[in-house]
């Protein structure tokens, strides 16, 4: 009822005691049923200040007089002034607070229940005084702060305490409640909230106040009427308005708290108080609100007699007995009238609302209708588009088919197919119409067949459709379910598509029926397709299931002629004897094999369709699917395929659809294209046969083959489609890839790339996000170790970068080198070698080519030229032989010395021969003994093979054995240890040439070195010659080693080296170990090899000897000298380069860092300069703004100053100048 606080407006009738500010508590009149009816129930509870005031003047009359006076005043002054403050229900409610200390008044609210009489008599508090009101108001506010905020005086306004209102009980509008008690009983006092029984309003009987209730307070309190019952009209119990009266007094809304305590239903609150005044009372204050219609004043309690004093201007007058009767009647009538009007208005309102609702509904319906129409239009448009698209697709398909046909089918077949397709097409319409019926029949037939389909785990053709995915429907049985899901998704689309296809088919049919017939004949002839094109199509589906092969058989599947035009074969295609999925003739596989093969196969298949039929059928269904090739199909192929499966599922439609869709699909493209497509698809499908079709198709088809009639087959044909579909947009066939395959591929990729990919059938773009998130996640994890990822290393190498580990290794190497260099004047070759990891020459010795092969290689000359770049020369067989002879001589001479020198050479060899030293010297010695045998054996075995006649052989065996003892022991060991490492290959090339010689030479030289004496006797000339050669060779070797990597040398070297190689112990050893394939033909029969080997030996020995010579000489002069020939120089240079590179890298990285820094700084600088510029411009703006404002100010000042002087004139003329 907050709304009702009329503080401002309602003059409280009770203003009477304005001056006193005391509240007279009228014993609550027992409320008549009307809650509000106030009957003096004599509950002292409400005694209020007034009562206190009254008490002193025990004389009733005095009290009345006073009241009257006050009433007069208040009406004018107080009403206007106070009433406003007072009428707040809040006050009333806060009756506990407001009713001074008497009874907790508890807001008295009319029980929401209705106007049932509150159990407790309402207490009427008269709070006429402003002060009191003020106080009360505040109190009440605190008290009832929750209730209405208007803390008015307790007024007549009966404002049920807000709580009640809040509670939702209809609050009785204050005007209703507020009885216009002259005493300013506040309605709250009147209305008692049943909820606040605490009010001690004792009133067991509503209407009657038991005498006992009359308390002292009551007596003392201002009572305009005697307590005695006689004062009350008997008819109206004390004030109890019987319901009728109450009704009269109170507006119905008051009586029954209106369900909507909505202001609309209450009398205007603002006028409440005035309303309470009955028209009979004069309303003195002109400004006061106009009295409301009498009905509004339910003031006069008819039964109450107000003392005449009160009646004067005070509202009390109303209550005077004189008026009470009249007013009661009048009020009653008014009330009734008003109630009538209210009811009328209510009804009106309801009707209004109904009408509104009707209109709303109407509008809704309108909207819906609009939407419907819109939708219809949309559909129309779509259909139009579809038709156009189909048209286009068909044209494209035809073109494509024409282009493709040749490639796929033999011309005859193509024509046949084309005719067939056309016919099919035409027939499709016919058939679809007729055939459709047939197909439907087929479908019906196939429907039963589907039972067979059970094979497919899910009978749903989807499975077949899955076949869609791959052609091997046959194989795919299991997977079909997955496929099925996919297919199912697409099925709806496909169905739509099929319907469209059917329509198109019919149109085309008309156009092409003649052609199609002719074509069909041709087709049948060509394809041996007994299947009628259209029915075939229809059948395809059904038959597909039944006999996938015939269905599509591609053109090849002629088995069932039924397919193409005719109704589904009555007899299921040959029992799928060939049901074996593998057996299925997979056009795709055929295609894959090659068109030719396929064609042949098709033909052969056709030839023995019986055998292949079942399988073929299975495959064919795939093919059928292929029909999807039509451009439209291609486009919609997937959709179609699904629909096809759907069709299959929906047996009747499917067949037509099958036929139609398959047929028509190809049909769209054009029969030829369709066939071509078929073939293509067959190929693709077969190619794809993979799981999808296999799964679906397999099911469908297997089941088909197994169950000849199974209608699911048609879907299978769809499957083939997956392989290739004609892409309308690309205008070319494109491979149709099943989602499963895609999924699979993605998963595989993901595995390879190292991220996790979950196979999710429903994979779609939205999953991309997840995958991306996952990738992010993975990216945040520690990366693969660089060193273990060759890809990464390769990538880094592009930028000249390497991994930290490698860098550290390099640095460590450098450090080691430096230390070594500092420690020993000359770097120790072995370390260098190992560091360089230059395989010991021996390792490199083995080669696959024989010298002859190498000499005969096509680019032999080029290779020779290449060698010359490194100052190397190719040695012809003759030269080699000469050299070898020389070596033999030298060896023979050396042998004696060698045996003696062996020990020395062993000691020396480690330091002398890099190769030997490579393997640890100690080991070498040990190994000499241990390995000698092996080496020797090897050398012996090799030697015989390679040995030259007599002399060579003799010399060699001894020498070899010796050499092997030395070299093999050291070299072999080194080699053995190294070779496994795989250095062999490396060294092979570099060393092939130089190394091989070196190998042997080294040992020889060592031995020689050890016993240089044996050489002394040697002829000086020869020695010089050999020395030169050895120097030459060592240089070459060094070069080779450095450029060893260069395979080029290998070619020629290989030849040369091969020969020499096989002489090399390393080779021998390797041969003994695991004879390398052809160590330069070492393994070849000695005879074959004899020439070159001998040469090799000669050359090697020669080299060796030369080197020995050289070494010997060197060693004689400086036995300990470790000069490694150019190699060392190269090594040093290499290191130098590397260091430089490292340095460069470091500098580059620093440079890069600096550049980046510089860049970022320059950016910042730029930004700063921008901001500075901005600030400057702003400053400029501010300055100009300030100037402008200043100017304006000055102007204003002028204006303001001048006008004062010439004001009048200024006024008239505008601003004075």
UniProtKB/Swiss-Prot annotation:
Low complexity bias locations: 43-63, 76-89, 103-114, 450-465
Effect of residue 627 to W: In a colorectal cancer sample; somatic mutation
InterPro entries: GSE-like, GSE1
Positions of post-translational Asymmetric dimethylarginine modification: 305
Protein name as catalogued: Genetic suppressor element 1
Biased composition (Basic residues): 813-822
Primary gene name: GSE1
Induction of the gene: Negatively regulated by miR-489-5p.
Residue spans of biased composition, Acidic residues class: 1099-1117
Biased composition (Pro residues): 711-720
Keywords, ordered alphabetically: Acetylation, Coiled coil, Methylation, Phosphoprotein
PANTHER family, sorted: GENETIC SUPPRESSOR ELEMENT 1
UniProt keyword annotation of Acetylation present: yes
Superkingdom of the organism of origin: Eukaryota
Compositionally biased intervals (Polar residues): 15-33, 831-840, 847-858, 1068-1085
Region Disordered: start-end pairs: 1-155, 324-385, 418-465, 526-579, 633-675, 699-720, 807-858, 903-930, 948-981, 1068-1122
Compositionally biased region (Basic and acidic residues): 331-385, 551-561, 633-645
């Amino acid at each position: 009822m907050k709304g009702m606080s009329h503080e401002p407006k309602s003059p409280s009738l009770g203003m009477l005691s304005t001056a006193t500010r005391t509240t007279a508590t009228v014993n609550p009149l027992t409320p008549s049923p009307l809650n509000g009816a106030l009957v003096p129930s004599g509950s002292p509870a409400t005694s209020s200040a007034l009562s206190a005031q009254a008490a002193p003047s025990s004389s009733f009359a005095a009290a009345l007089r006073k009241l009257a006076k006050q009433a007069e005043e208040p009406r004018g002054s107080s009403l206007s002034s106070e009433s406003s403050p007072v009428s707040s229900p809040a006050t009333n409610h806060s009756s506990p607070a407001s009713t001074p200390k008497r009874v907790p008044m508890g807001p008295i609210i009319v029980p929401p229940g209705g106007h049932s009489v509150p159990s407790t008599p309402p207490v009427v508090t008269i709070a006429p005084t402003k002060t009191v009101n003020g106080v009360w108001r505040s109190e009440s506010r605190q008290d009832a702060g929750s209730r209405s905020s208007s803390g008015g005086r307790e007024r007549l306004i009966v404002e049920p305490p807000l709580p009640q209102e809040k509670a939702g009980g209809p609050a009785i509008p204050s005007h209703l409640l507020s009885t216009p008690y002259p005493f300013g009983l506040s309605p709250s006092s009147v209305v008692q909230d049943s909820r606040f029984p605490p009010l001690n309003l004792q009133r067991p009987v509503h209407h009657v106040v038991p005498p006992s209730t009359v308390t002292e307070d009551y007596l003392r309190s201002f009572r305009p009427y005697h307590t005695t019952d006689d004062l009350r009209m008997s008819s109206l119990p004390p004030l109890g308005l019987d319901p009728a009266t109450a009704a009269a007094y109170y507006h119905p809304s008051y009586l029954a708290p209106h369900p909507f305590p909505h202001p609309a239903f209450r009398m205007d609150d603002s006028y409440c108080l005035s309303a309470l005044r009955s028209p009979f009372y004069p309303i003195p204050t002109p400004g006061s609100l106009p009295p409301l219609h009498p009905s509004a004043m339910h003031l006069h309690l008819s039964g109450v007699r107000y003392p005449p004093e009160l009646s004067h201007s005070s509202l009390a007058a109303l209550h005077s007995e004189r008026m009470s009767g009249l007013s009661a009647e009048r009020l009653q009538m008014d009330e009734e009238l008003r109630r009538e009007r209210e009811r009328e208005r209510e009804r009106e309102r309801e009707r209004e609302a109904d009408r509104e609702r009707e209109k709303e509904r109407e509008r809704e319906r309108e909207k819906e209708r609009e939407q419907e129409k819109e939708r219809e239009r949309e559909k129309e448009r779509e259909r139009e588009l579809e038709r156009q698209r189909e048209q286009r697709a068909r044209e494209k398909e035809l073109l494509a088919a024409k282009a493709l046909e040749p490639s796929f089918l033999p011309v005859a077949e193509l024509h046949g197919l084309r005719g067939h397709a056309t016919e099919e097409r035409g027939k499709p319409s016919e058939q679809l119409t007729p055939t459709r019926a047939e197909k439907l029949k087929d479908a019906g037939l196939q429907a039963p067949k589907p039972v067979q389909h059970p094979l497919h785990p899910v009978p749903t053709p989807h499975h077949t459709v899955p076949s869609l995915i791959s052609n091997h429907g046959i194989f795919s049985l299991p997977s079909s379910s997955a496929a099925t899901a996919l297919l199912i998704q697409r099925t709806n689309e496909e169905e739509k598509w099929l319907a469209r296809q059917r329509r198109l088919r019919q149109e085309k049919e008309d156009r092409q029926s003649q052609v199609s017939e002719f074509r069909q004949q041709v087709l049948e002839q060509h394809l041996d397709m007994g299947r009628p094109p259209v029915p075939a199509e229809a059948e395809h589906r059904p038959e597909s299931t039944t006999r996938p092969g015939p269905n599509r058989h591609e053109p090849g599947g002629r088995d069932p002629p039924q397919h193409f035009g005719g109704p589904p074969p009555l007899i299921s295609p040959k029992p799928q004897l060939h049901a074996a999925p593998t057996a299925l003739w997979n056009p795709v596989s055929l295609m894959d094999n090659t068109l030719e093969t396929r064609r042949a196969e098709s033909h052969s298949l056709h030839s023995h369709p019986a055998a292949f039929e079942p399988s073929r059928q299975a495959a064919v269904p795939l093919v059928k699917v292929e029909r999807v090739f039509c451009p439209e199909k291609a486009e919609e192929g997937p959709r179609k395929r699904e629909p096809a499966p759907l069709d299959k599922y929906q047996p009747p439609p499917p067949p037509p659809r099958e036929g139609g869709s398959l047929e028509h699909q190809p049909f769209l493209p054009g029969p030829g294209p369709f066939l071509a497509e078929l073939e293509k698809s067959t190929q693709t499908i077969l190619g794809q046969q993979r799981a999808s079709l296999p799964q679906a198709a397999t099911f469908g088809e297997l089941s088909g083959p197994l169950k000849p009639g199974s209608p699911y087959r048609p879907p299978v044909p769809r499957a083939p489609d997956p392989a290739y579909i004609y892409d309308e947009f690309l205008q070319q066939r494109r491979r149709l890839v099943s989602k499963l395959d895609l999924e699979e591929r993605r998963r595989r990729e993901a595995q390879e790339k190292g991220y996790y990919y979950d196979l999710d059938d429903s994979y779609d773009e939205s999953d991309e996000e997840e995958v991306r998130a996952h990738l992010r996640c993975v990216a945040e994890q520690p990366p693969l170790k660089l060193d273990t990822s060759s890809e990464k290393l390769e990538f880094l190498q592009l930028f000249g970068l390497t991994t930290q580990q490698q860098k550290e290794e390099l640095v460590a190497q450098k450090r080691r080198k430096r230390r070594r260099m500092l420690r020993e004047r000359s770097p120790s070759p072995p370390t260098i070698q190992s560091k360089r990891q230059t395989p010991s020459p021996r390792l490199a010795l083995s080669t696959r080519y024989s010298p002859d092969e190498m000499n005969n290689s096509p680019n032999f000359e080029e290779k020779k030229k290449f060698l010359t770049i490194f100052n190397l020369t190719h040695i012809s067989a003759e030269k080699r032989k000469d050299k070898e002879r020389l070596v033999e001589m030298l060896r023979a001479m050396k042998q004696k010395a060698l045996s003696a020198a062996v020990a020395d050479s062993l000691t020396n060899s480690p330091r002398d021969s890099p190769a030997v030293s490579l393997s640890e010297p100690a080991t070498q010695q040990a190994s000499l003994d241990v390995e000698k045998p092996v080496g020797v054996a090897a050398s012996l075995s090799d030697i015989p093979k390679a040995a030259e006649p007599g002399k060579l052989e003799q010399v060699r065996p001894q020498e070899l054995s010796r050499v092997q003892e030395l070299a093999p022991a050291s070299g072999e060991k080194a080699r053995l240890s190294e070779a496994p490492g795989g250095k062999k290959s490396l060294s092979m090339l570099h060393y092939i040439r130089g190394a091989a010689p070196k190998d042997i030479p080294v040992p020889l030289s060592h031995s020689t070195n050890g016993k240089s004496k044996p050489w002394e006797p040697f002829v000086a000339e020869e020695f010089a010659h050999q020395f030169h050669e050895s120097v030459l060779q060592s240089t070459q070797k060094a070069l080779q080693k450095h450029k060893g990597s260069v395979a080029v040398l290998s070619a020629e070297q290989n030849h040369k080296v091969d020969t020499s190689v096989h002489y090399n112990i390393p080779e021998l050893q390797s041969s003994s170990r695991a004879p390398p394939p052809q160590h330069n033909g070492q393994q070849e029969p000695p005879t074959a090899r004899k020439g070159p080997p001998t040469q090799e030996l000669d050359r090697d020995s020669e080299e060796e000897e030369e080197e020995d010579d050289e070494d010997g000489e060197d060693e004689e002069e400086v036995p300990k000298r470790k000069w490694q020939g150019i190699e060392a120089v190269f090594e040093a240079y290499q290191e130098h380069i590397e260091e430089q590179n490292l340095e460069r890298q470091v500098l580059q990285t620093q440079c890069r860092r600096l550049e980046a820094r510089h860049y970022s700084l320059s950016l910042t600088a730029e930004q700063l300069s921008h901001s500075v510029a901005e600030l400057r411009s702003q400053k400029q703006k501010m300055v100009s703004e300030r100037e402008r404002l200043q100017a304006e100010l000055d102007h204003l000042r002028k204006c303001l100053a001048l006008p004062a002087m010439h004001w009048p004139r200024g006024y008239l003329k505008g601003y004075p100048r």
